[in-house]
């Protein structure tokens, strides 16, 4: 439990129906009593039971400046595990700010970013992975991303890691007894049993790591470069995916000279689109700079949509683009399928994950592209209710644990003795405990909560 009582606006900034100011800490009820007067004079704020609500006025000194509701939560049955009071006022920014100022004048301290969730973690209300899921669910744009975050918030990842820790802990207890007490009649673990336990743990961790990239796409989105020759239909594609005329489209080649950016929601995936200048040889210095930026965006992108004009034969520029896309997460969109085809798609098939005929002027192509992107990025294979890793911290810890388990298996197979196996299992357990936050350093914890906004 923390000694200070904190206050902050817990709802989004700006005008709205209501705003919520949250108090948490040992003096929450006392602070609330100084800024909230119940409409029923027989009600005592400091004696309010948990999970109850009172209607009344918000005051600063003798000035009642708004009416609203106070919700009461008694420790440990609250979000933070502390005494909590949530004050719901009208949603104007000025009213909410004044209510926070009144709380601070009444003895509360301003909350730091993420301090409520940090207290929930420190008070044992949630694991570190669940705390990270809070931020993921706040920032989720799509249904699947929100479902993944909710699964972690509900403890799916913590439970899965707990299962693997339990298996390794049981193994380590037996190994430690055999190594540390040789005079006792402790049966030696046979290689077959070690292989079975370690192999199962490695398989589970491999599965989490394998699905990380697809999960990250659902949570965070992906940068997507739209590339191709002039007039292939790149800007038309951008407008199709955006749902409005974001880019200028003309029959004049080279209309787009700089990178045009637009974030769109394509199915459950947020694409940060970059419509680039048409790729061709040019003596125009301005256009040449745009083309240089086009190649740079292609090299940096997590997804490439390469647009080809299906009504014209392949050109040298088309082939150069295809070669640049080889081995990358790239989809070839052969545009203008509504016109007679003169494009030999077989020539570039080996350079792309998929080659798809589309018409960027038709709404139906949007669904086709969305399905192709989901297949390529693997998001259509993700179970949104299963355990998943979120963020580089969790991925790094899971990878260290997997590598340590692999080292233990190598020690078994190499006949290095149970001492070597025990050291590797210890390393794996340390990594898993860091993942869940059980032995995370103060620096790691600070890094996690730095991502949070004030009020959460």
Regions found by a protein language model. Name each.
Residues 1-147, 151, 155, 331:
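A glycine-rich (often HGG/GG-containing) alpha/beta subdomain
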Residues 2-9, 13, 143-265, 282-284, ...:
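C-terminal-of-GTPase-core extension/linker across diverse P-loop GTPases
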Residues 16-18, 51-53, 300-304, 327-330, ...:
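Short glycine-/polar-rich loops that comprise or flank the Walker A/P-loop
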Residues 54-66, 70-74, 254-282, 300-303:
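Switch I (G2) and immediately adjacent beta-strands of P-loop GTPase domains
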Residues 109, 270-272, 354:
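Conserved beta-strand segments of alpha/beta enzyme cores
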Residues 242, 277-278, 302, 309-310, ...:
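Short glycine-/small-residue-rich Rossmann-like dinucleotide-binding loops
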Residues 273, 307, 333:
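Generic enzyme active-site microenvironment
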Residues 287-311:
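Inter-motif core of Ras-like GTPase G domains
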């Amino acid at each position: 439990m923390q000694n200070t009582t904190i206050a902050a606006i817990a709802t989004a900034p700006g005008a709205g129906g209501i705003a919520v100011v949250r108090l948490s800490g040992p003096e929450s009820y006392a602070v609330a009593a100084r800024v909230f007067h119940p409409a029923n004079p027989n009600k005592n704020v400091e004696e309010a039971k948990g999970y109850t609500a009172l209607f009344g006025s918000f005051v600063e000194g003798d000035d009642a400046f708004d009416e609203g509701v106070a919700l009461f939560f008694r420790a440990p049955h609250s979000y933070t595990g502390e005494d909590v009071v949530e004050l719901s006022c009208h949603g104007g920014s000025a009213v909410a700010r004044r209510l926070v100022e009144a709380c601070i004048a009444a003895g509360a301290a301003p909350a730091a970013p993420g301090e409520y969730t940090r207290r929930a973690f420190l008070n044992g209300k949630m694991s570190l992975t669940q705390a990270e899921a809070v931020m993921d669910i706040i920032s989720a744009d799509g249904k699947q991303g929100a479902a993944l975050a909710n699964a972690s918030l509900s403890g799916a990842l913590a439970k899965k890691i707990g299962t693997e820790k339990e298996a390794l802990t049981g193994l380590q207890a037996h190994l430690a007894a055999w190594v540390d007490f040789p005079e006792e009649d402790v049966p030696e673990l046979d290689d077959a049993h070690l292989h079975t336990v370690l192999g199962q743990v490695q398989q589970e961790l491999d599965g989490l790591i394998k699905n990380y990239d697809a999960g990250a796409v659902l949570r965070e989105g992906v940068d997507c470069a739209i590339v191709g020759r002039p007039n292939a239909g790149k800007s038309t594609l951008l407008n199709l995916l955006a749902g409005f005329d974001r880019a200028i489209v003309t029959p004049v080649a080279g209309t787009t000279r700089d990178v045009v950016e637009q974030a769109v929601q394509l199915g459950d995936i947020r694409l940060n689109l970059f419509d680039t200048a048409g790729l061709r040889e040019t003596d125009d210095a301005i256009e040449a700079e745009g083309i240089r930026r086009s190649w740079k965006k292609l090299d940096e992108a997590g997804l490439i949509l390469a647009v080809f004009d299906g009504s014209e034969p392949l050109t040298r520029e088309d082939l150069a683009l295809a070669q640049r896309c080889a081995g990358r997460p790239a989809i070839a969109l052969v545009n203008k399928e509504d016109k007679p085809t003169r494009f030999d798609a077989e020539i570039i098939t080996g350079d792309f994950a998929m080659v798809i005929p589309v018409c960027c002027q038709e709404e139906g192509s949007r669904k086709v592209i969305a399905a192709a992107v989901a297949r390529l990025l693997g998001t259509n294979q993700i179970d949104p209710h299963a355990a998943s890793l979120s963020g580089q911290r969790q991925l790094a810890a899971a990878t260290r644990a997997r590598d340590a388990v692999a080292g233990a298996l190598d020690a078994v197979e190499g006949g290095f003795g149970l001492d070597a196996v025990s050291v590797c299992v210890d390393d794996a357990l340390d990594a898993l405990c860091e993942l869940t936050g059980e032995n995370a350093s103060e620096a790691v914890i600070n890094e996690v909560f730095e991502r949070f906004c004030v009020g959460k």
